[in-house]
């Protein structure tokens, strides 16, 4: 009988990170700095409102300053950009996110690129991704992509070493697929990465070679049990929403077929796996930004 897969509990790992962050926030406050995290919400999408309120609740719990900025759904490009400029200049704000998706009439790329890279809480600003491309082994002094960092932290905090492992990533989105390889191939992590997607023809063959599979395509159950090497670690970041025809309620499906858990050695639940880690690492980026700013000011280089 196969041994049950070990659960990669994102809630427990995120709680540990938040406990560590609370200590770091207390040290900053003792030096007169309260890390400030801000969100920009345009419109009143219920899912976005819920996500934003959750971020603020958790940041306040660890002692951070919470700054919530909202604009109506018909806000102009100029109005949104003016708010971005305001947060860039606000010394009380150390990092912020623009909640996506934005209303369709707005130029999302132009807005995101206007964010001060030092205050990029998501870690997805082109400047910060460029720095990551150029930096294989040196110290990182810019925000890191939250979800990819969350995947790695979740494994490492469960005693799983990625060094020498073959990681197959399914999905080519910027949030995870295209960025996680930049972190996994750093010398400090030392994994080998194969990037696949919904258009990959020999996907099953590649998946069967993987020590670790990261499902991030947003394609329901694209990773089947037959695709998984026995003992592999499975991290499910994919989200597909479907309406249950019987109840009429929305149901979330991941990229990894639940039957794969019987073959895997490690598996992250979805939800409850990488999701909580993303929020914890978002707050980490902001606390680190506050620490860097204070260090620069103390050294007279700010």
Curated annotation (Swiss-Prot):
Homodimer. This is Bifunctional protein FolD. It comes from Arthrobacter sp. (strain FB24). The keyword Hydrolase applies. It catalyses: (6R)-5,10-methylene-5,6,7,8-tetrahydrofolate + NADP(+) = (6R)-5,10-methenyltetrahydrofolate + NADPH; (6R)-5,10-methenyltetrahydrofolate + H2O = (6R)-10-formyltetrahydrofolate + H(+). One of its GO terms (molecular function) is methylenetetrahydrofolate dehydrogenase (NADP+) activity. Pathway: One-carbon metabolism; tetrahydrofolate interconversion. The gene is folD. One of its GO terms (cellular component) is cytosol. Catalyzes the oxidation of 5,10-methylenetetrahydrofolate to 5,10-methenyltetrahydrofolate and then the hydrolysis of 5,10-methenyltetrahydrofolate to 10-formyltetrahydrofolate. It comes from the Bacteria. One of its GO terms (biological process) is purine nucleotide biosynthetic process. Keywords: Amino-acid biosynthesis, Histidine biosynthesis, Hydrolase, Methionine biosynthesis, Multifunctional enzyme, NADP, One-carbon metabolism, Oxidoreductase, Purine biosynthesis. NADP(+) binds at residues 171-173, 198, 239. Belongs to the tetrahydrofolate dehydrogenase/cyclohydrolase family. Its EC number is 1.5.1.5, 3.5.4.9. Pfam families: THF_DHG_CYH, THF_DHG_CYH_C. InterPro entries: Aminoacid_DH-like_N_sf, NAD(P)-bd_dom_sf, THF_DH/CycHdrlase, THF_DH/CycHdrlase_cat_dom, THF_DH/CycHdrlase_CS, THF_DH/CycHdrlase_NAD-bd_dom. The keyword Cytoplasm does not apply.
